[in-house]
Amino acid sequence: IDLLIKDIPHTLPASEEYLLSGMGEFTDFDSVFDALSDAELKFEPVLENGEKKELTHATYSAFMRSPNADVRLMAHKNMHKKFGEFNLTLTKNYLNRLKYSNYVSKTYKYANNFVRALEGEEVTEKVYNTLIGAVHSHFADFYRFAELKRQKLNLEKMRVCDFYANSFTEKAKTITYEEAQQIVKEALKCLGNDYQKLLERAFAERWIDVFPTENKSSGAYSYSTGVSHPYVMLNFAGTTEDASTLAHELGHAMHSHYSETTQPEPKQQYVIFVAEVASTVNEMLLARYKLKMAKTKIEKQAIAESLLQNFYATVFRQTMFAEFEKQINQKIADSEALAPEDLNAAYEQLLKQYFGSKVELHEYAKFEWSRIPHFYRPFYVYKYATGFVSAIAISQKIVDDQTG
């Protein structure tokens, strides 16, 4: 009822709603990006051990974890160089997406797209700004982490492509999908028998599309249909991090299943702001399980490093993305004319600010913004960061058998 009351000032006459509803077919900027990024862009191969290896969205993460610094740099450059070749196309598509979102927001009598997105999640601007401010206040800690990482990797200079490299060779092993299933089940036993049975169902009934295939969307997602069980899409490549991805996406799927089977239909939907908590709690429980099962000091160090890398990827980077998104959306709301160079410069400035003067950027790093699919879901990425921080606290309470 409260939400309905809040929506009253933003409700349009039926005739206007009808006109807006018909625009979706002509404003599908997301699918244009997906077609270009996932199907049409072909990246230069990466030279590894004297052999040319295919670079795709699915293999990119493995290259970023390579122990060979030259391989990491080549993969990072080749990926972003190709996106740079389509900089104008991608800029126009993204800006048109933002212009459309801002137009719809103003039509619904919101000040801009930022306000509409946050109100839809029942989140205040203070939460968003506090996240950015908190990360800014800990830049010095991140710079110290970067320096420690450089020393462990024995690099003369830390580069933007080196943060996913593993300092401990024991961590670089590969796992099968069946092994990942078993690890996830063991790690999530603390969630109870019902949860375990549901995991077994998901595996046995093949809720999960596991492996990468040609023209398949990159990344990992969970989909709720409302009429059947949820579906999960992975691009499993056999890294230990893929087990974390499996746990994460199953967190979304279980959340959807429980909501749809226990709540009346009007209450089944949940805001994304809390969705990322359910998924990331699973990741944290998996990490705690792996720490508990580690037998040697170096194993524990490797797992701790993995947690720090997850924090880097989920809190640090996603907050940087969130700040970029806010900057560009504000310029759109202010009707500023923007060119590719403006977006590239804004992103490069944030890279320099977040990574500091001692981390080396290459000439194609500034194009990274244009390959982030979540930017086509306005003001989504900050929820990864808030979800991660919340999940750390919640997972600790679960392990300690506390309530709250």
Which stretches of residues belong to each language-model region?
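A well-structured
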Residues: I1-E170
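Short pre-active-site segment immediately N-terminal to the catalytic Zn-binding motif
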Residues: A172-Y177, I183, C190, T225-A247
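Post-HExxH zinc-binding segment in Zn-dependent metallohydrolases
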Residues: Q269-E299, L307-Q309, A313, G387
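Long, K/E/R/D-enriched contiguous segments that form extended
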Residues: K152-C190, Q196-K197, H255, L308-T314, ...
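Catalytic zinc-binding patch centered on the HExxH motif and its immediate surroundings
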Residues: K173-I175, I208-S228
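C-terminal, non-catalytic "cap/extension" segments appended to globular domains
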Residues: D2-H10, D28, E122, Q151, ...
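Active-site recognition of the HExxH zinc-binding catalytic motif
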Residues: K109, A237-S259, E276-S279, M284, ...
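Conserved helix-loop functional segments at active or binding sites
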Residues: C190-K197, Y223, H252, S256-P264, ...
